[in-house]
Amino acid sequence: MVWGGGIFQSVTEKQLSRCRQRLEAFIAEMLAPLGRRERRHWGRVYVRGLLLNGERKSVGALAERLPEGNEQNRQQFVSPSPWAWEPLWQGMAERVERAFPNPVAWIMDDPGLPKTGEHSVGVARQYSGTLGKTANCQVAVSLHRSDARGSSPLGFRLYLPKEWTEDAARGGPAGVPEEVAFQPHGRLALALSDQTLGWALEKPPVGLADSA
């Protein structure tokens, strides 16, 4: 998926059906590290739901747009299911490397995702460079591989404001582990860079960071 200025690009069910074969092959490759067949199945259903039109991306909202199976199984996949996320991101980064074989730069950014509620992990009234203002949103730190054609993400780290790491009454019910401590954007960026460098990807000549 080429980064186009937004977190996700939505498509209709009809458009999705036209590229189903390519999408299914892509999802199968990306979800292979999940191992168990059932886990890969619900991962595929979840990704398809995220690509459909609709502002709300909760499990319940996805169930309304893509009724396949039951909501409890979807919730199990995105919440307590104990699967390792790093092999998936490494597989994605390696695929991005193949798509952008001659990178000009790695670009660090902090995209924001506007939210209307207050229960999504990390949501707070905070500044978003994507929105260009302070708003109720989630903010992530992201690393992108870029060339003359465009860019695509190598990884993300969700930024958690202090109210999410220091208030157990808020972070606990949302599944934030007790051992997670507050980390500013810069520290998240360094951790993301170290992780990506550990995957032995080709290093670009330039590294850039968004200063907005």
Residue spans of the language-model regions?
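Conserved, well-structured functional cores that handle cations and Mg-NTP chemistry
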Residues: 3-6, 10-212
